[in-house]
Amino acid sequence: PASLEFAYIPLSELMSGPTNFTFETGLETRLNAAEERGHQLVLRPYIDYPKLDSGLPDFLSDEVEMRAYSEHGGGFSPDYENPKLKSALFAFIEEFGQEYDGDSRIGVIQLGLLGFWGEWHTWPHEDWFPGPEFQSEILNAYVNAFNQTLLQVRYPIVDSPNLRIGFHDDSFAYSTVGDVNWYFHPTLVAAEANESWRDNPIGGEIRPELQWDIFDENINLSIEKQDFDLCVNTTH
């Protein structure tokens, strides 16, 4: 039986000004709906989701440069080095923690905010992604804001392996295990984060093109269609 639900939430639905937040309309309805079904919500705030409208809050629309791209269905990537955007992100994280740390309706908060889908990358435009210092500041802002609620980030980058943060594999059973260095489990091993599961949650999303048959008894496995149980057992 299912006990968790997942939601991507644009930052524009959670924040309407530098110190103005709209959790009541942007988050409460989702949390209450999940609770009514006996579930907890796993959520990820985002700014840039390919194919969808930008999640940049309106009050920043004239302040932050947006870079157009065509990959992944197209979209607009914000200038993450913009001081007003940085300030807004830190303000959001702080208020988010004050309002929701320890809220029993939340299962896990995936940090999101940065990169395509909130996945902490802008591939193939790697130079658009913020540098290690800002990445670390966001990671630590979340850890400082949330003392009880579980956290996850997409990759074991900068100082995340040493923080109270787990990891999520958004291509689960597609590029989870194996000898390819950018696959999920090898990146955990390389970052010495493969024991993180003992204290922090490991999760993710079954790669969309695998979802239709990954649980079939007679599935034909391949390099990019991996054994689900093996992936679960390896990553814990």
PLM region descriptions:
Residues 1, 35-37, 108-117, 122-236:
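Catalytic-core regions of glycoside hydrolase
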Residues 27-41, 62-110, 133-145:
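An active-site-proximal structural segment forming one wall of the substrate-binding cleft
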